[in-house]
Structures are given as structure tokens and as C-alpha cells.
Amino acid sequence: MFGRSKMKRTFSTGLAYVFGIAFAAWGVVLMEKADFGVSMAVAPAYLLYRWLSPAWSFVTFGMEEYCLRAVLLLAMCLLLWRFRVSYLFSFVTAVVYGFVLDAFMLLGAMLPARSVWLRAIYYVLRMHFCAAGVSAMFHTYISPEVYELFVKEVSAHFGADINRFKTGYDCVSCLIGVAMSFLAFGLWHFEGVKWGTILCALINGYVIGRFSTFYEKHWTFCDRFPWRKYFAPDAAAQTSAE
């Protein structure tokens, strides 16, 4: 999985996929524990979870995540006006991520959160874990979770900078979260959408970009298994031609 290539270590794209899911899920747990506001990307799912779980105990945060990702995947296909079988693997990733998130939520329940300073530490760690996870997913050919896939595919389709596009996407998600909070919990009641959400929306794209720069400076991402053609057929065909 690791090696050396031109003064940089090589890093498996498959391992980047695993780390991406784990880091992002743990970052969300820390974010929920900090209680300064969830990230804009997960705000809609979190609000639905908080709204529905008191009435239906089987509803989990992870479940709402992959249900909403299915809707986002459909919206992406309509926007790009194309469908690939590899996109279905993004939904599989969303389901895997949902189960990992629910498992980590059980672990996170044991973390103390009595002081505001400890919660602040959780918030800072959360931002770094989530950014590291999202950036890792951007460096793997395995279909990322639908949220990352949407940012990656739509920004490429329209020729937009991926980090700036993500910041814009996050801001829109933040506004949707605020609207959902008002509808579900009452006007001017900010449930799950707080100052931490706004701060995250403004700087998350930048932090992810810094992690990407760090990764690319120290590692060369390479495939250890011949599976790229099943997930990125266009890239595989181009590589073969070269």
C-alpha cells in the first residue's frame, strides 16, 4: 500500500477510500458532540433525524444520510443528463458511510462534553477530520459518497474550480438547513444550524484544498487493484490510449 516514487511515497487509492469514509464519519460525530452547529452538508439529514427519531425510534442519523443521498444522486443525473453504473456505487458508499456513522455515534455518546472548551476542541478536530476525509475521497477512483460525487462531477462538467464550487454548494446547503429548521422547529429556532455551521460553510472548501495540497505534496496516489475501469471508464480508456 505504501512505497516510494520520485521522492514521494505512494498511497493506495483503495486505502484513501477507507480512510475517507472513516475520517468523514468520525468528524460528523465530533461535530454533533460539539453542538456548535452541524456542517451544511449533513444539516438536512441531521434535521430530519432530529425531527423524525422521537416518533420513529428506528430512524437513525446514518439512515437519513443515505436516503437524502439517493435524492441528491437523482438530481445530479438529471442535471448532467447522464447516468453511469458507477454512480450506483456512490449510493453503496452512502449506505456504508451511514452504517459507519451510526456505529461511531454509539462511540461518540461516551465522549464527555461538559465544558465549552472541550466542545471547542471537538469542533476544531471535527473540521480537520471531515476535510481530511473529503479530500481523501477526491483522490480515489472508487465512487465517493454522493455528496462528494456531486461536487466532483458537476464542477468538472461546468469547468469550475472544485474547492470554490464546494464552498458554494455548502452555502446553499446551509440555507436549506436554516429553512428546514424553521419549518420543523419553529420560526427563528436554529436547531442544528448555528454559528459553527456558518463558519464551516465559509472555510471548509479552503481547508479541504489545503489537505489536498498536503496529500499531493507527500504522496502519489496509485491503484493496487485493476478495478478503475468499473468506476471511471473514461479515465481508464484514456490511460490505456496513452
Regions inferred by a protein language model and the residue ranges of each:
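Core subunits and conserved enzymes of cellular information-processing
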Residues: 2-242
